[in-house]
């Protein structure tokens, strides 16, 4: 869409994967007893309690290879799976159990991994949102912000950190910082 308006910004697309485990202690990882969590280190891992699936979800954050929407494979990366499985066995051993399934997804990230939530400077009636690989958790808030931008051109929230005009989005060879 941005190309239609004469814009090209720096985005990196990676193929990520998540695994769902059927823990024999599933009640300990239910929504009522277990939080969404992030292991903020290098590498970074995150997980969700059992909700909607018959098991807890775990993944490495930005552990996948660069790709494009056209060239992605949907194939599970055994090395990425092993890193996640090893982490789970070491840090949450009672969450480990039979694998329900592993699936792939795409992250689309600006170099600074911050969201883009703004209108286009020369087209204030065009709202832009880029999720930076972790937007799904904020979908309802993004919907509210985008509807405010579409209806009034402004939001009740401070969107200055997420401006479309950030220099790093247009830098020729930006330093990529993908740590959350």
Regions found by a protein language model. Give the residues of each.
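C-terminal catalytic lobe of FAD-dependent flavoproteins
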Residues: 86-180
């Amino acid at each position: 869409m941005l190309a239609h308006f004469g814009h090209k910004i720096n985005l990196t697309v990676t193929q990520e994967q998540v695994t769902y485990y059927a823990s024999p202690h599933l009640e300990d990882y239910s929504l009522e007893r277990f939080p969404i969590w992030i292991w903020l280190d290098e590498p970074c891992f995150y997980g969700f309690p059992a909700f909607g699936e018959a098991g807890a979800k775990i993944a490495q954050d930005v552990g996948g290879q660069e790709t494009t929407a056209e060239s992605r494979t949907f194939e599970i990366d055994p090395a990425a799976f092993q890193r996640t499985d090893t982490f789970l066995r070491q840090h949450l051993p009672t969450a480990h159990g039979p694998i329900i399934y592993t699936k792939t997804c795409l992250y689309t990230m600006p170099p600074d991994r911050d969201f883009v939530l703004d209108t286009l400077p020369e087209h204030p009636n065009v709202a832009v949102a880029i999720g930076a690989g972790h937007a799904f958790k904020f979908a309802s808030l993004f919907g509210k912000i985008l509807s405010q931008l579409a209806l009034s051109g402004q939001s009740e929230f401070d969107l200055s950190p997420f401006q479309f005009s950030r220099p790093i989005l247009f830098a020729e060879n930006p330093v990529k910082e993908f740590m959350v």
